[in-house]
Amino acid sequence: MSGLIAYCRQGFEPELAAELRDRAVLLGIAGDIHAQRNHGFVLLRCDPLHVDTLLQQLHWRRLIFARQTLRLHAELKTLNSRDRIAPILAALPKTPCFGDLWIEYPDSDMGKPLAGLARSFGNALRPVLRSAGRLSAQLHPQWPRLHVCFLSGDHVLLGSTRSVDSAPWQLGIPRLKLLPEAPSRSALKLEEALITLLTSNEREAKLRPGMRATDLGAAPGGWTWVLIRQHLRVTSIDNAVLRPSLLNHPLVQHVRADGFRWTPPRPMDWMVCDMVEQPRRVAERMAVWLREGWCRHMIFNLKLPMKKRWDETRLCLERFETQAVVPLTLRAKQLYHDREEITVYASNNAR
């Protein structure tokens, strides 16, 4: 068996399946896609000769609805609860030796009850793998990492990935803590966007103290709060009121205005937007900001409809890129802290 395992948000398996299918077709690769709603993952089975290409081109950062992508090695069903280890050892590829082991389960109603089993099984499997020469004694991030994903007590997927090519969090979920002083939970969305959509080098270069940013539809101020923690000067646009702690902050200027109509008096380094509005309207307005040179970098959310979400996502991003005109770096992801939405990062490469 060969192919890809991709984790996703529960309920978005059809969107991920459609995205994988469309992108595989563009690569000229045929594959069999298995997806069941609310299971939290999708399988793409294909010819072994095509797996490396898929892993390179369908990198987790490039896929919108995937939290993690793995090389699929085996699917084991009807495992005996008294000895799950022997069949797993037998099903592993002869090479390589793995540098780390993650025991996982889908982030779904079906998968979450397996968390306890995953913890205990990892403690049992790890020493056996080391004794068999299949797992390094010490962590080796540069070696492939073995993933054992429990779908039930007797049903397991075996996969692997290289650390440099994968999401650095188990289940593809960054564990962020909402601080008491955060104005709203939406702060977690922007925090996750910054660590998911930008590399560490990009964050260092593009989020420098003293830079200027605009937060459209800012109230109550969750995204503004994240930006000032990066020491950016923020103009917060909203007719509603910000939290008092932000109103009195020296890095914050609150302007009572409609976020869709307001224009900056001078170019900004950043613009962020988490307004509840039709996704096509948001995409078009965001394109104006780049086309007019009002900002260089932006992060915004697109609230998706209940149906045809992949089609709407593709349409909005194509419309945004076309109308922005300028050469772009464009990345989008459905984040763990998103709901029925995706988060988009765009940067003007001409400036």
Curated annotation (Swiss-Prot):
SUPFAM superfamilies according to UniProt: S-adenosyl-L-methionine-dependent methyltransferases
Subcellular location: Cytoplasm
Residues the entry annotates as binding S-adenosyl-L-methionine: S186, A219, P220, G221, G222, D238, D258, D274
A GO-annotated cellular component: cytoplasm
Enzyme class: transferase
Keyword Cytoplasm: yes
Gene Ontology BP, a term: rRNA processing
Keyword NADP: no
Listed InterPro entries: RlmM_FDX, RlmM_THUMP-like, RNA_MeTrfase_FtsJ_dom, rRNA_MeTrfase_M, SAM-dependent_MTases_sf
Active-site residues (renumbered): K303
EC number, as in UniProt: 2.1.1.186
Catalysed reactions, as listed in the record: cytidine(2498) in 23S rRNA + S-adenosyl-L-methionine = 2'-O-methylcytidine(2498) in 23S rRNA + S-adenosyl-L-homocysteine + H(+)
Source superkingdom: Bacteria
Assembly information from the UniProt record: Monomer.
Similarity comment: family membership: Belongs to the class I-like SAM-binding methyltransferase superfamily. RNA methyltransferase RlmE family. RlmM subfamily.
HAMAP family per UniProt: 23SrRNA_methyltr_M
The protein's role, per its UniProt record: Catalyzes the 2'-O-methylation at nucleotide C2498 in 23S rRNA.
Name this protein carries in UniProt: Ribosomal RNA large subunit methyltransferase M
Organism: Xylella fastidiosa (strain 9a5c)
Gene behind the chain: rlmM
